[in-house]
Amino acid sequence: MQGPNGEGAVPEAEVPVGGERRVDGRHEHAEETTAAGPPAATAATGDPEAARRRAERRAERVTAGATELEQRLVDLLRGGLAGAEQAGGELWEETAARMVDAQAPGLASRVRELGSIPSSGPGWPVRLLEECALLHLLDQGWLRREQLPDGLAATVRSRVGLKAAADGPPVRDHWLVLAQYDTADARLTTRRVWLHGAESDRTALLLSYGAAGRAPELTLPVGLALDAELSAYPDAGRQRAALGRCFAPPESTPIRPRGLTTAQAAVRYGEALRDDPWLDSVPVALDRVVPVPDGDGWQLADADGDTALPLTRTTASQSGLWRLVALSGGAPVTVFGECGHRGFTPLTAWPAGPGPAVALS
């Protein structure tokens, strides 16, 4: 890596052990989608006993699916990875369909991703083994969920694909809109909105959905603040939230998120992995960083230190990178984004002095 002045090596902020392990960030999208709705049984009938029986029956089906998936992973490893390349995606599609039948859409999504790995380029056997290990870990988490701490058990249920309600107490705050961006597949458009509470110092994620080709309804302008209540969903990190009552329309604000160094950001991701081993990234604001070239990519280097975080490869092909470079002009800036095993994805930036937020996504 290059330092901010282009000379000498800048050591990267250390990525936690086990961090470099996933092919892309599509896993979280699937699990967030399946967990976004209301608690299915109780909302539909209002009969707690009937809801309990349905939940038990579904848990039994998920358990059967997880057990079958474990055996298929064992068969894969015993038969050798070359068989996975020869079989193509059909084997995985069949297994994914079995997980859908077991009412475990989160497992189905992860299984489908396995099918795409053999064609993902050099190094695919290592990536396939890593993904199989994470899938095995999720299977075992479900099968032994009663032995897990409550927060981790809730995360496992969410990752498997069970719906949950936003049961946290409403938290009223002036929520700064940190970033907003969409991802899409053939069926769904997902909008992610990151917020930061001025008083609670909490970062929260709102999810909104639209049919394929249609933008979700929820739109919050980046850089403005919203006086509103949020309620958290029950997972280990409790970052996902539902938007409740709004007391005023979004308005301009001088609020900025409190920033970290690049080394502190890497540590935060490592700590988050202890609560959610399947986590792709965490929201982080970096303070006083400078975008600098790094070979055929870019990095954000600490202006006052000797560490840096590489930008994700997809960032280099986006116009937001050049907006970030232009905003910085070689001077330190504050950057909010997502920090994970693939690097840092910048989403919004603020100049060193007074000035509005600049959306990069």
Functional labels for PLM-detected ranges:
Residues 1-37:
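Short Cys/His-based metal-binding microdomains
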Residues 3, 10, 15, 148, ...:
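Intrinsic-disorder/low-complexity coil detector
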